[in-house]
Amino acid sequence: MTICTLTSSAEQQINTICKEHNVIAVTLNLKGGGCAGFEYDWGTISDAQDIEEGDEIIATNEGFNFVISKHSLMFLIGTEVDYVKSLVGSNFEIRNPNAQSSCG
């Protein structure tokens, strides 16, 4: 079962963030709030000891990690994370088949 997949663009951006901020991982968690009941909470990890047992770890091609909190896993099954650049900016885009609705 695949919890989450990263596009090559998302993987490249995770590598860039980790290098620029001297961290080992970018994290994604869900927390209560937002217009659909949940909102995505992004973060970084600088020490491997901060990764909890049961967290989902996806290694990038440069040895950095994308970590999903064990508490968020069941809500993110089948999710694809992309990094999109446009004229108005750039951001991670989450395609979550489990989301009932989205903001905006």
Task: Please state what every model-predicted region is.
Residues 1-104:
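Signature of N-terminal electron-transfer/Fe-S-associated modules in redox systems
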